[in-house]
């Protein structure tokens, strides 16, 4: 009966719209699914090596205001952040963290860090950095996911996190499924938060266990965490810890009642 209802819903979905599908909760951010929460078929980024920004800026699909400035696209980083500085496309993305944010004149700036740390994307299957836009105006969402990316120098440890930008409210959400600690490399440093274009304004997450900002030189880990950043004017954000409910970023697999694959994709 459940599969019958799902198939009818699937038919209606293809007839009526290209909207997202909500079926049941899941606790994993990435992978291949036949039951998903807020399913989002995303585009694979061009990043297939470490310490680089994506070759081109990617469109958000809507206007998003960050520290009071409007943007329509962003650049992805191999090291766990996005920046609205479009001149960074195809440029080096720093991995060394030797000073806290803000650090004027040094990347990342104009950035959302989820977190910024030294991770090691590479050729498949380690190039799984995806992005996409879902929903209908004026309530669209832009999502970036770093899925099971090895930590540099601790490649047995895999990092998974996600950034979601909301149209209209300009809210930011971050979901950290697995944020390991590689204490033997880069001082174990990782920075989670926001910084504006000139490093004048910044908002850093306070670790709920350690009671300190997740900024250099703090060593920290996270599992199945959710955070929201709500604009408080144009110079700061209110940060709240929220329930871990990421958008599933992967390939949707459609099957019939007998389990036969009908197709993949949105």
List PLM regions with ranges.
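Bacterial Sec-dependent N-terminal signal peptides
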Residues: 1-23, 27-30
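Extracytoplasmic Ser/Thr/Pro-rich, glycosylation-prone low-complexity segments
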Residues: 20-254, 260-266
């Amino acid at each position: 009966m459940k599969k019958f209802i799902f198939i009818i819903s699937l038919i209606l979905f293809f007839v009526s719209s290209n909207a997202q599908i909500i079926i049941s909760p899941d606790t994993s951010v990435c992978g291949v699914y036949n039951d998903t929460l807020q399913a989002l078929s995303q585009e694979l980024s061009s990043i297939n090596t470490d310490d680089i920004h994506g070759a081109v800026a990617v469109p958000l699909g809507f206007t998003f205001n960050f520290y009071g400035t409007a943007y329509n696209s962003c650049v992805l980083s191999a090291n766990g952040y996005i920046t609205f500085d479009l001149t960074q496309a195809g440029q080096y993305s720093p991995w060394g963290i030797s000073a806290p944010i803000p650090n004027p004149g040094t990347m990342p700036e104009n950035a959302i860090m989820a977190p910024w740390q030294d991770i090691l994307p590479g050729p498949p299957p380690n190039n799984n950095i995806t992005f996409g836009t879902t929903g209908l105006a004026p309530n669209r969402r832009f999502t970036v996911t770093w899925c099971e990316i090895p930590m540099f120098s601790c490649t047995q440890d895999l990092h998974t996190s996600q950034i979601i930008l909301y149209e209209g409210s300009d809210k930011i959400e971050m979901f950290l499924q697995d944020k390991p600690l590689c204490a033997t490399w880069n001082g174990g440093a990782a920075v989670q938060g926001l910084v504006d274009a000139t490093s004048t304004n910044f908002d850093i997450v306070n670790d709920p266990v350690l009671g300190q900002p997740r900024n250099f030189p703090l060593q920290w880990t996270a599992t199945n965490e959710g955070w929201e950043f709500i604009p408080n004017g144009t110079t700061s954000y209110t940060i709240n810890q929220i329930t871990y409910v990421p958008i599933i970023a992967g390939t949707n697999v459609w099957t019939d009642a007998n389990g036969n694959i009908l197709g993949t994709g949105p």
